[in-house]
Amino acid sequence: MGPFEPVTLASAEAASTRYVGFERHPFPRCFTCGPERDAGDGLRIFPGQVEGRPDGTVAAPWRPHSTLAGPDGVVAAPVVWASLDCPTGFTVMTADADVPPYVLARFAVRIDAPVPADRDYVVMGWSLGDDGRKHLAASALFDEQGVTVARASALWIQLRA
């Protein structure tokens, strides 16, 4: 399976239950993936390991609220960027308290199509490799038909212990 082959919404929902951020989160109030955010406050995207995919392949469902959209019903670009951010980080983050967390160093996004609010999407992230404390990852946002509507690449740096 290629990295841009999406999982089903049901698989993303199942993966989300394995989100390591529920056990340990360096930024629990993160706008995108913070488990201490209430429904309607932040994006609440919880990317967890996908069964049957290589380690570091995560997925989560996302249904953007209408408050995240403009008058045209389309989710604002900065919010789409945010939806793709944390799924790249959780390709490498663990619940192990002895492992220092990672922080985002570089991020590039391409939005391929409008992202209407109040629809179901699957967000996926996967590892592209490591170089010392550097971790490269990618992510994509898929619509209900499995079409890629946005994609990103990211460089994460692990903090020193």
Which role does the model predict for each range below?
Residues P61-R63, A108-R110, M124-W126, A140, ...:
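Residue-level recognition of well-ordered beta-strand positions that form the cores
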Residues V74-S83:
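Short, conserved micro-motifs enriched in small and acidic residues
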Residues P64-S66, C86, A113, Q158-R160:
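Non-catalytic surface loops within mature trypsin-like serine protease
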Residues M1-V74:
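Non-catalytic linker/capping segments at the edges of enzyme domains
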